[in-house]
Amino acid sequence: MNGPAADRRPLRPGANRPKAPRNVVPEGGRGPAESGRWRTLTSVLARHAALVRSRRALLTDLGKALLLTLLAVLAAAPLAAVWGISHARVDDYLGPHRVNFASNFGGEVEVNLGPIGNAYLASPVRPIGLTITVGGVGATTANLGSIFSEQTLAAYTSLYTEPREAISGIVERLAHDAVWEGLKAEAVLLLGVATWRLRRQLLPPWIIRRVTTRRAVAIYVVVVALVIGSILVPQKPKDPRYPVLIADGGRFSSLTVDSVLLADVLDRGIKGVKLLSARQQQAVKNYVDTAAVSLSEQLDALPKPNSDESMILGFSDLHCNQAMTELISRLARATEPSVMLSSGDDTVNGTAAERGCIRREAAISTGVPFLVATGNHDSNITEAQMRAAGVTVLDGQVVERAGLSVLGDDDPEHNIPFSVERTKDRPETEEQMAQRLVDLAGNKHSDVLLVHQPAAARVIMDTSNPPASLVLWGHYHAQSGPRVIMHEDGSWTVGMQEGTAGGVREPTFTSFSTPFSPPLISADVYFYFRDKATGLITGVQPVHFLPNAKLVIDDRIATGDLGKLPLETRIRLGGASATATVEPSR
């Protein structure tokens, strides 16, 4: 057949039959819709399985990363610890002198006295050592004589009497600084490890080929071994050493110096400290023993609250006095107050070396809450030591303890140690601090407002309707009050300027007096009686330890009559009865 039709392909058999619809399911088979659903389910399961595998891989990678990080931290720890210990520095006071403390690996305690030489003691924690650089030491014989005057020796008595407590506070600060320096070194080393992990992206190929992981680890191990080895090998002294004769056989039996002049000076100085320490300790013991007898003879006359009252023990300006700390502790055990309050100046200079006196004072409370508004002779170091000992240090916020709401703050001024000069801890005056506390109290009416200086207390007490039932302060080492401010609603505020609980005479105190002496003036402690229903202070009873070790218990001073309290005020304050509970004066 010729023409176009001849080139056509012949039709296959059945080619002209109509096509079956796509949705027709052959008998016994799976239709297209069901097949699509099956394929969708399969793909979902496949994706889920892939996701599970990826999560497992992610967790595996994360676990490997954490393990490598942990190994890196452990590997870096030795060098970080060495760096931290060898770079720890602290500035503080020992006695009246400004001192720099620096830890090292010399294996001994070196006291650098400038031009007159150095003193050395074996370190109790070898190979770790300590360099103590004492400031303000001159080279002339006249200056050396002033260093070991009776006043200066008295200031160093605590170092001889309680060397462990005096040094431990400084060691704590050094340890904190060493940890901080060590953490910084650890971070730098870990950054180096992270950089090593990214070396292929950061370094040229020829360096990568030469410095392999195995070689890097070997180099690091050698460096660590050399550093640790150099620390453990004892170092021989470079300069000649001369023993201090008075130290032979005593607690400083290993004391040596590198100067003959210094050996003679320390010989005389340690003799003076030993003599003065023995004298002071005996005086403290005699005072405590005599005062304890006077206390035991008057147990029945000690302050006692009525059944509907609680009792607060308050004091101020203890100044680390050892004798009074012991006697106040006995007084607290005998009277069992519900809470203790200090209006500050608990230390002499606020140095780390006064940790021992802070621990003794904290033990006075015998388990009851102890709250403090620190004074101008205390410091941030003092506050940290108090918190560590369990004392609540007020910081401008209301604190709830033993059913009392107490508001107070530390003094904005701080005395330079062993000086009458003061510096500002923050840009705030006494009056501004007091107004801030008044504004914070607002209409909440705290139970107690606690400050240190009268300048602050004056602002609070001159406020219309002072926002506290009890306002306490100290600072002047002289009792004044109680002063009662009546409110418009018939309630009242009691204000009290407390004397010195340490019996410290101010002129002597500023001349480097020491906590290791009996009270020089009346040592005063106060008991405040608080009505449980209304929270009002109904009485004050001062207790005095005189310089002759006699105990004087004043009569209870009534500060308010609950019977005259308006009924609506009583109900608002929480009291339901109008019956007076004021105890008559004894």
Located regions from the model:
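Non-catalytic terminal accessory segments
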Residues: 2-298, 567-586
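Core catalytic region of metal-dependent phosphoesterases/phosphodiesterases
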Residues: 207, 302, 315, 320-400
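Beta-strand-turn-beta hairpins that frame and shape the catalytic cleft
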Residues: 259-271, 303-312, 397-408, 413, ...
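Extracytosolic and intramembrane catalytic regions of membrane-associated proteins
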Residues: 286-306, 318, 326-336, 384-388, ...
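Active-site metal-binding loops of divalent metal-dependent hydrolases
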Residues: 316-319, 344-346, 376-377, 410-412, ...
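His/acidic metal-ligating clusters that form di-metal
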Residues: 333-335, 402-407, 413-494
